[in-house]
Structures are given as structure tokens and as C-alpha cells.
């Protein structure tokens, strides 16, 4: 964009995930959980699925360290036209940190919903590859048939919005050096989503247990 075109490429890509995984073990585990919810990794084995090729073809994520570093270096070069390099690196590092923190909340929420699938409380839609949340079905959280019949999973919808809307706002706002927006419309909403998901899951488990009796 600094050269006058409208190309918008970043180190973290559209999906906010990357390979290789971060060095921090907890963050790496959280990113793996998110990759499973994107359908890029098999939730049971952790192995890549065919959807990884779709992500590659659409260039939705940086999948090598070199690709990630190339985009980060471009950004630093742009920032240093007005700011010192140390300031630019510090600000970009803050963006990385809020993503790490957001991923902790995101992974916890995914695991809560995945547990409902695992225990049969949420039924796997026929066209889902796995009994697991699937973000790349977008708003069709009951699968194509469920969307047609309006039989969608509400807790999945909240989880999807947490990922696609509030997580993105949290880290993208930091990369735009807008901490106020990142907090109010990103981080605060992420914590709200997680609380709502936990409460809904508790209710769903209680209802399911009562139904079984």
C-alpha cells in the first residue's frame, strides 16, 4: 500500500495464524487448537488436512518463517520512514503479544465447544469433516443443511464471532496502534464471549443430563 496500490498483506495474514508455530509452548498449543478449528489440522491426529492446500492457494496465511519475516521486514521498512526502527519493532511486538493473549482465550473457548461435540451434546453436521467447531464453514454452524433449515448451533455462532470479529479487532487494532479500539471492541468482547460460551456450555450440559434421565 505504501507504493500506491491496494494490496494488503501482513506477516500474520488474514487468519492470524502462521507456520512454523511460535516458540512459546503455550502459544504454539493455542495456535494448534485454532488451526484445528479452521479445519487445517485434524482435531484427532493433529496432521494436516486437505484444507491446508485451500489456505495455501488463497494465500490466507504465511506458512514458512521466510514468508512471515519478509512481510514483517516490509512493515518495518514502511514504519521507519517516520519512526525509529526500535519504536517500530516495539509496536509490532505489542501486536504479537495481544495476539498471543487473545489466542489463549480463543483456544480455551474452542476446547469448551469441542467438548460438547465430543460428548454428543452438539451433533456433528453431516457435511462437517469432524465433530469439532469449523470456522471455515463461516455462519453455517449446522452445516449446509442446518443453515437451510435454520438449525444452527448458537454456541458455535458465538465462538465463530469471537474468532472472526473480536479476535481480529483485538490484534489488528494493535497493529494500527489503536489500543483503545483494541481493548473496547476486541479484548473486552473476547472476555465477554468466553464467559458466555462457558455459561452456555454449563446450561447445555445440565439440560442434556436432565434429558438423559
Predicted regions: what they are:
Residues 1-208:
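Primarily the internal scaffold of c-type cytochrome electron-transfer domains
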